[in-house]
Amino acid sequence: MLLPGLLLLLLLLAGTRWLWGQWKLRKLHLPPLAPGFLHFLQPNLPIYLLGLTQKLGPIYRIRLGMQDVVVLNSNRTIEEALIQKWVDFAGRPHMLNGKMDLDLSLGDYSLMWKAHKKLSRSALMLGMRDSMEPLIEQLTQEFCERMRAQAGTPVAIHKEFSFLTCSIISCLTFGDKDSTLVQTLHDCVQDLLQAWNHWSIQILTIIPLLRFLPNPGLQKLKQIQESRDHIVKQQLKQHKDSLVAGQWKDMIDYMLQGVEKQRDGKDEERLHEGHVHMSVVDLFIGGTETTATTLSWAVAFLLHHPEIQKRLQEELDLKLGPGSQLLYRNRMQLPLLMATIAEVLRLRPVVPLALPHRATRASSISGYDIPKDMVIIPNIQGANLDEMVWELPSKFWPDRFLEPGKNPRTPSFGCGARVCLGEPLARLELFVVLARLLQAFTLLPPPDGTLPSLQPQPYAGINLPIPPFQVRLQPRNLAPQDQGERP
């Protein structure tokens, strides 16, 4: 009898809170409300939300469980909220789990959060500035050598990309590319994403009160998080034991010294080892599968468009001779490559639905009132497919970005105060990996000619998952075998 009684009490409290909230909102000029309350069960949510703009306009509300959420579906509304009024919408709602005061991605806006972001960004962009590009180049060359050993054999390229991006982050954070460590980290990230995407976890987004009831899925998620934390704690201990003042070989060294330097600072800005721990976690969770998925989408699109692949290879051959140095600062010398990356990010953004924002104070968007604590969700993919902005928005057409000033910058990594911390790293990885891959290989479908599906799998997590597919990597310094390959 205890469990049903507890559930009834929770429902009564939630209902009372909801009625009180609705009464307070009655005099405000709010965005229109979409009918229904099962919107978040749609298999391709960003596209579904974009479709609602036909009747409701680019900004509207949807009901998520017992609360209303505002959805932004255009560049104009997203930029107004996250750039022009970034302080108003820099907050985060209470999330499902985790060390909220330590988490950079999910933590709420505060002086401590700002200090945490500053240290993490400094570690990535200053601490690893000189070693990041050579490291990515080295690991990409090793990746190409592994792929050359499988030349002509169909390869599940997404798994290879995922291991590569995990190796890069392991080197940046831990200073270690040991294959056993990387495999352990990679498996942990995959387990976390799989657990997070399970319906038993996703339902908590719609009905948060269910988190107080027994939930095997939630217990499994917590167990995986504990395994993840054990790995990170081991690395932190090793780094502390070998730390030398004024020297660093990776991001952990840099951040540990940064924490030590501000030990006597103000309490509201004072960081500690737990912040370093969560910075590492955020980088692995946010930077492994997202970049690997974007690279996989790029390969899939190029398999469907061999004429663009051929033009890219001609550009690379013209600008980069054998053994030439590939430098990101010279990226504008490869305009078609940069345009192709931009087009892949437009059609398949790193995070199609940005993590929810919370209004830190009463504000407005497009003339609509947004009360304090209202949750805002920017539909990045929806904005990238807006027919009012993009010509033939669903078409893969990199040339659209070859005309300067004609197309807006896409917010594929978010924007404003909450822009993805790893954006510079991800853009560098996309540039180096695609350039070296297309220099070394021609991308071909399997012998049966099957092309990958360009329809994302049902969306429930961070990125747009690509259906599994295989690709043959034909070394360009070898003549294609007489098996009907395209040149």
UniProtKB/Swiss-Prot annotation:
Keywords: Endoplasmic reticulum, Heme, Iron, Lipid-binding, Membrane, Metal-binding, Microsome, Monooxygenase, Oxidoreductase, Steroid-binding, Steroidogenesis
Keyword DNA repair: no
Single GO MF annotation: iron ion binding
Catalytic activity: progesterone + reduced [NADPH--hemoprotein reductase] + O2 = 21-hydroxyprogesterone + oxidized [NADPH--hemoprotein reductase] + H2O + H(+); 17alpha-hydroxyprogesterone + reduced [NADPH--hemoprotein reductase] + O2 = 11-deoxycortisol + oxidized [NADPH--hemoprotein reductase] + H2O + H(+)
Binding site for 17alpha-hydroxyprogesterone: 228
Membrane topology: Peripheral membrane protein
GO CC annotations on file: endoplasmic reticulum membrane
UniProt-annotated binding residues for progesterone: 228
Listed cofactors: heme b
Binding site for heme b: 92, 117, 357, 418, 420
GO biological process, one term: steroid biosynthetic process
InterPro entries tied to this protein: Cyt_P450, Cyt_P450_CS, Cyt_P450_E_grp-I, Cyt_P450_sf
Keyword Metal-binding recorded: yes
Subcellular location per the Swiss-Prot or TrEMBL entry: Endoplasmic reticulum membrane; Microsome membrane
Top-level taxonomic group: Eukaryota
EC id: 1.14.14.16
PROSITE patterns tied to this protein: CYTOCHROME_P450
Function: A cytochrome P450 monooxygenase that plays a major role in adrenal steroidogenesis. Mechanistically, uses molecular oxygen inserting one oxygen atom into a substrate, and reducing the second into a water molecule, with two electrons provided by NADPH via cytochrome P450 reductase (CPR; NADPH-ferrihemoprotein reductase).
Domain characteristics, as noted in the entry: The leucine-rich hydrophobic amino acid N-terminal region probably helps to anchor the protein to the microsomal membrane.
Family statement: Belongs to the cytochrome P450 family.
Name assigned to this protein: Steroid 21-hydroxylase
